[in-house]
Amino acid sequence: MVKAVFPGSFDPLTFGHLDVISRSALLFDQVIVAVGINTSKTAMFTTEEKITLISNNTKNLKNVSVLPMPDLTFKFVSSVGADVIVRGIRNVRDYEYERDIAEINHRLGNVDTVLLPSKAVYQDISSSNLKEVAKFGADISHFVPENVIKLIKLKTK
């Protein structure tokens, strides 16, 4: 049985994230979506809100669970007994960044990373950009689920 961890800040959850989760669910026996904190960004949602949003949008995927990740990724992977880390990549910049992080996780935690290229339709989706345009009332329904839109609207009133 191969267990994978898909870590991220998911602030907000996008259709690109959901695509990586659903594709991972087909590839691995168990997928843990690990909700971490990105200290270099200001979060719009709490960890609990993110867990609820992800859980509600993945409830049809029986081999997917969602947990908070209070630690470094390689430590979390070890603590849940996972075999690999999964990351989505949209472009060359993502690849270079993820390759470097994968090397660190391998050296420190002896864990491999599987990189899933984004489908073309999701390559331009950036959580940071979506938060910014949503603050000004732009329609982001092509990029995020409806429950995410509702929560963004509540938070940006």
UniProtKB/Swiss-Prot annotation:
This is Phosphopantetheine adenylyltransferase. Pathway: Cofactor biosynthesis; coenzyme A biosynthesis; CoA from (R)-pantothenate: step 4/5. Keywords: ATP-binding, Coenzyme A biosynthesis, Cytoplasm, Magnesium, Nucleotide-binding, Nucleotidyltransferase, Transferase. Substrate binds at S9, K41, T73, R87. It catalyses: (R)-4'-phosphopantetheine + ATP + H(+) = 3'-dephospho-CoA + diphosphate. Pfam families: CTP_transf_like (PF01467). It is an enzyme of class 2 (transferase). The record marks H17 as: Transition state stabilizer. Its EC number is 2.7.7.3. The keyword Repressor does not apply. One of its GO terms (molecular function) is pantetheine-phosphate adenylyltransferase activity. It is found in: Cytoplasm. InterPro entries: Cyt_trans-like (IPR004821), PPAT (IPR001980), Rossmann-like_a/b/a_fold (IPR014729). GO terms for biological process: coenzyme A biosynthetic process. The lineage of its organism: Bacteria, Bacillati, Bacillota, Bacilli, Lactobacillales.
